[in-house]
A protein has these predicted regions:
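Hydrophobic/aromatic residues positioned on beta-strands within the core alpha/beta folds
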Residues: 89-91
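Acidic, metal-coordinating helix/loop segments flanking the phosphotransfer/catalytic sites
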Residues: 42-60
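Conserved phosphotransfer microenvironments
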Residues: 59-81
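The C-terminal output helix
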Residues: 124-138
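C-terminal output helix
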Residues: 22, 114-123
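Conserved acidic segment of CheY-like receiver
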Residues: 7-28, 61
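A generic structural motif
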Residues: 31-40
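Alpha4 helix (beta4-alpha4-beta5 surface) of REC/receiver domains from two-component response regulators
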Residues: 93-110
Length: 138
């Protein structure tokens, strides 16, 4: 994938606009120098997230575990229902919620308050994994 004209689509879900903005600012325009630029699609409702995932075209998903309905439940639903589901970064508020993130089958987890470097590095790793394992289009 050429980074000159390619774009990575990142879905960000939270019912809190401030959380969505923090995620967007942490990742920035390009999560790492070796990766394409990021394009964000932001949603505050579960229905909109599932509709977007059904349409496809998302490379990485960032879900707020504290949103209503919870991002961890949405993660589990996406992993169960979406063919070739993109990797998911779950945001949890409490360390003790780690077991829920495991149950949800999230690919990575970060805690709140958000550490911008941790978010960007984790998203970059998920994107690299997605690129490396992407199914070829015939």
């Amino acid at each position: 994938m050429s980074t000159a004209d390619a774009v990575i689509k990142i879905l960000v879900y939270s019912d809190n606009a401030n959380t969505r903005a923090q995620v967007r600012l942490a990742i920035g325009r390009r999560p790492a120098a070796d990766l394409p630029k990021a394009e964000f699609v932001e949603y505050a409702t579960q229905a909109a997230v599932i509709e977007q995932l059904d349409r496809g075209g998302v490379d990485v998903i960032v879900l707020d575990g504290e949103a209503r309905p919870g991002g961890l439940g949405i993660c589990r639903q996406a992993k169960d229902e979406i063919y070739d589901c993109p990797p998911v970064l779950a945001i949890i508020a409490r360390r003790d919620d780690g077991w829920l993130a495991t149950w949800s089958r999230a690919d990575a987890v970060v805690g709140q308050p958000l550490d911008p470097m941790a978010v960007a590095n984790t998203v970059a790793d998920l994107i690299r994994q997605r690129i490396a394992t992407r199914l070829p289009v015939l």
